[in-house]
A protein has these predicted regions:
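S-adenosylmethionine/decaboxylated-SAM
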Residues: 4-177
Length: 177
C-alpha cells in the first residue's frame, strides 16, 4: 500500500481533471515515490477515458530542501508497476521534458518538483506555453506559512505570485484561472 498521506492533499484536483477532460494529455512534474502518480493512474483507469499521462522527474541528483527526502526511482517503479500501462515516465529534467511537447498541446500540468523560487519560476515559464487555452496549470505546496507542521516553501508562493496570472488556492495547491 502506498502512503499518500504525507502531503498529498490534491486528490480533488486530480479527480476534477479526469472528470473534465476526454482524449487528453496530462503531465505530472515531480513524482517523488509515485503516490500521486498512482492516484491519477487509478482515476484514469477507472474512467475508461483516453488520457495520456506523463510522469516527469529526475529521481536522482536532487538536492532536497526543507528536509525533503530524495526520491527513489526504484521505489517509484515498485509503486507504479501495476499501473505502468497508464503512465509514461520521462526520467529527465523538467525543462528538457517540456521540450518534448508542442505549445498548447497539454490539457493538464501539475507542478510539484523542486520547490525553490528559481526552479518553480522556471517550471512555470517552461510549462505554461504547453497548456492549451482550455487547459489547466496547477501546482503544489503553495503556502503563506507552514501548512503542514514544519513545512513551508516560500519559493513556491513567490514564483506563483510573480508569474503574472490570476490563481486560486485549494488547500496547499494553486490553480491558474
Amino acid at each position: 500500500m502506498i502512503n499518500r498521506s504525507a502531503g498529498f492533499d490534491f486528490e480533488n484536483i486530480y479527480t476534477e481533471m479526469v472528470g473534465k477532460y476526454n482524449n487528453a494529455t496530462f503531465v505530472e512534474v515531480g513524482c517523488f515515490e509515485g503516490g500521486s502518480t498512482v492516484y491519477m493512474a487509478e482515476l484514469i483507469k477507472k474512467s475508461g477515458k483516453n488520457i495520456k499521462f506523463y510522469a516527469v522527474d529526475l529521481f536522482e541528483n536532487y538536492r532536497p530542501t526543507n528536509g525533503q527526502v530524495s526520491p527513489s526511482y526504484k521505489k517509484f517503479k515498485q509503486n507504479t508497476l501495476r499501473f505502468a500501462k497508464y503512465i509514461t515516465v520521462l526520467k529527465m529534467d523538467s525543462v528538457v521534458a517540456s521540450r518534448q511537447f508542442a505549445d498548447k498541446s497539454i490539457d493538464f500540468v501539475f507542478l510539484d518538483a523542486d520547490h525553490t523560487y528559481k526552479k518553480v519560476k522556471r517550471d512555470i515559464e517552461c510549462w505554461m506555453p504547453k497548456v492549451k487555452d482550455s487547459g489547466t496549470l496547477a501546482g503544489h505546496d503553495y503556502t503563506e506559512s507552514s501548512f503542514f507542521p514544519g513545512v513551508y516553501f516560500p519559493g513556491v508562493s513567490r514564483a506563483v505570485k510573480g508569474a503574472g496570472f490570476d490563481f486560486n488556492v485549494d488547500k496547499s495547491s494553486w490553480i491558474k484561472k
